[in-house]
Curated annotation (Swiss-Prot):
Encoding gene per record: GSTZ1
Gene3D superfamilies in the record: 1.20.1050.10, Glutaredoxin
Reactions catalysed according to its record: RX + glutathione = an S-substituted glutathione + a halide anion + H(+)
Function: Acts a maleylacetone isomerase. Also catalyzes the glutathione-dependent dehalogenation of dichloroacetic acid to glyoxylic acid. In vitro, possesses glutathione peroxidase activity toward cumene hydroperoxide and linoleic acid-13-hydroperoxide.
Entry protein name: Glutathione S-transferase Z1
Any Pfam family matching the protein: GST_C_3
Species this chain originates from: Arabidopsis thaliana (Mouse-ear cress)
């Protein structure tokens, strides 16, 4: 493992969190050993006083590396990429790097917040199930349409070529959730669908899947 001899990293995670999912992929790609600490969001573990000391926002993921505590998935991934630079998660090519940042941003600000557990719970108090589903699906459809147009001319085996980069870490969990949680039809997004097929062939992505996490309900395994 890349962090052999160092204190083991600690990842506070929830099996179904797409934000934690993308960090698990990064850790797997880097070959890093870590302790998985489950935070059950449905039971409210994120509001526990001990966890709030680690992350005052009460969200996952949180990464603890010795005295360093990082609570945002993008910040965690960038921290890991700088501390453990192989394999790199950003391409040298400036244009491809910008595309990776754009894809990440679309997921981070345009799609994922609309299916965040806290947001969905709040919305459920205001509208019925059908309206909630339509609201979430609209955000996914809008985001996937933008991603398809962004990546159609630069994708290879993966989002921005034949190497795994930052965009792939954000796309894989989002597509997985869209298909398995929200039954999104991927036919209108052939580039994204092709990328997703490639992810399913990679051990680092397979091992990071929600249903393979230790806190996943047995019915999902």
């Amino acid at each position: 493992m890349a962090n052999s001899g160092e204190e083991k990293l600690k990842l506070y995670s929830y099996w179904r969190s797409s934000c934690a999912h993308r960090v698990r992929i990064a850790l797997a790609l880097k070959g890093l050993d870590y302790e998985y600490i489950p935070v059950n969001l449905l039971k409210g573990d994120q509001f526990d006083s001990d966890f709030k000391k680690i992350n005052p926002m009460g969200t996952v993921p949180a990464l603890v590396d010795g005295d360093v505590v990082i609570n945002d998935s993008f910040a965690i991934i960038m921290y890991l990429d700088e501390k453990y630079p192989e394999p790199p998660l950003l391409p040298r090519d400036l244009h491809k790097r910008a595309v990776n940042y754009q894809a990440m941003s679309i997921v981070l600000s345009g799609i994922q917040p609309h299916q965040n557990l806290a947001v969905i719970r709040y919305i459920e108090e205001k509208i019925n199930v059908e309206e909630k589903t339509a609201w979430v699906n609209n955000a996914i459809t809008k985001g996937f349409t933008a991603l398809e147009k962004l990546l159609v001319n630069c994708a290879g085996k993966h989002a921005t070529g034949d190497e795994i980069y930052l965009a792939d870490l954000f796309l894989a969990p989002q597509i997985h959730g869209a298909i398995n949680r929200f039954q999104i039809n991927m036919e209108p997004y052939p580039t994204l669908a092709k990328c997703y097929e490639s992810y399913n062939e990679l051990p680092a992505f397979q091992n990071a899947l929600p249903e393979k996490q230790p806190d996943a309900p047995s019915s999902t395994i």
